[in-house]
């Protein structure tokens, strides 16, 4: 009897619903943190291993997928990168605009402290853009080691175009390597329930949520604005693109991409998850192999919200008046900063001083705002990453489905 049961159990774990398994891991993680903090801290190793495995496989996955898709791209075959890029930029700006409206409707103030720490933000938007451009000419090995996805994309695109002139054997080898890496990614993702279990247990055991209560209103504004973008703004953009009910697609992306990103708190680690979801949705591989890593770099709606809300909270605390043109300018600046957030150590929080500089707020006070961001980062960073990463696959799917509908309608007319 036992010899028959164990394979059945293994098959259920290997082929069962991943979402249900993750929910079980989530509940067990919360229970373990509540029952025994030392045990919860110990199983944190499972979460560290899971995130480490995703981060390890993501750079080589992006390199091989982009190389393979470009090298094997047939002349005349259309991709949908332009409309996806437009959706990324429009979505980020819309998120910043929504954050301005939300901050005016529910103004927040901060309890500023002087514990900003030894961190050095970029001196201006030019430096942010310079860092982004310099990352394009990074050494390919260095880009793979450091997870510099702009550099990886540049090298992958360049090598892909070069390999178009190679013989079919070489192209087949690159394609086989791409399939092999994809298999490894699927294997890593099957361990997600154990990773989520470890991440939830250790996070609750080491930090808890007691420190967040002092910033309850600010968190409500931040998370509320992110929910508004995820459930109202993004569905409107998707409806505009596909002209049908967007919510099945929106909720699918939040469930199968956002949940992972919420717990891993890393857009880079979530790239393999998004790639797998795109494959499940039967999207064009040539498109999503480029748009997903590109989105992890520049599609930063959550970062735009964080920069805008915390900047306006600092402005309210200092009693600085803000008129409509200035608020609109802040939306533009926050969008530009958010698009460059991946090129800055510390991400969106260290770009807050750039936005604060618009209102004449000194760097000392701006860094205190950054310190507040680090305090609430347990929840803020999780929600931000979930919004950013789920939007990558959402906009990619919307653009691909819109193109499929256009081609189907064109075929019917003919």
From Swiss-Prot:
InterPro entries recorded? Na-dicarboxylate_symporter, Na:dicarbo_symporter_sf, Ser_Thr_transp_SstT
A GO cellular component entry from the record:
plasma membrane
Membrane topology qualifier: Multi-pass membrane protein
Q: Where in the cell is it found?
A: Cell inner membrane
| Domain of life the protein comes from | Bacteria
Query: Pfam family of this protein, just one?
Result: SDF
* Topological domain spans for side Periplasmic: 37-45, 105-142, 201-217, 321-331
What's in the keyword line of the UniProt record?
A: Amino-acid transport, Cell inner membrane, Cell membrane, Membrane, Symport, Transmembrane, Transmembrane helix, Transport
Entry keyword Ribosomal protein: no
- TM region(s), chain numbering: 16-36, 46-66, 84-104, 143-163, 180-200, 218-238, 300-320, 332-352
Taken from the record's topology, the Cytoplasmic segments are 2-15, 67-83, 164-179, 239-299, 353-414
> Reaction catalysed by this chain?
L-serine(in) + Na(+)(in) = L-serine(out) + Na(+)(out); L-threonine(in) + Na(+)(in) = L-threonine(out) + Na(+)(out)
| GO biological process annotation, one example | serine transport
- Family membership, please give it: Belongs to the dicarboxylate/amino acid:cation symporter (DAACS) (TC 2.A.23) family.
Give the NCBIfam families listed for this entry: PRK13628.1
Task: Summarize the protein's role.
Answer: Involved in the import of serine and threonine into the cell, with the concomitant import of sodium (symport system).
What's the protein called, per UniProt?
Serine/threonine transporter SstT
Corresponding gene? Answer: sstT
